[in-house]
Amino acid sequence: MKKILAILVLFFAFSLSTYAQEERKEELVVLAKKDSKDVVALLELGDKEQIDFFNLFYYKYDEQSKTSSDERKKVISNIITKKLEASLTADKFDKLKKNTALFERVIN
């Protein structure tokens, strides 16, 4: 009887853990979609760029959620800034930087 109870407890603990991870991933998808849509709308880019930026921002949110180190978060922010700069023309990157609220949100 004790073994059955222990198995049930482990099963429910595993189920709750899995549910929490799925919920966190859904939140990351929502944040990445919002950032990519806002950047694409501001810079008047196409669907391919939106997909590319979604993947970039999802990577950013996923990596930031895995760490609590401020130093690591700064490294991630620098990576995102460099990838944005490499992906965009100089004019479009400057336009994004001028919109400081959006720029700070997408790199931090």
Task: Report the location of each language-model feature.
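Bacterial Sec-dependent N-terminal signal peptides
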Residues: 1-25
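Charge-rich (acidic/polar
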Residues: 21-108
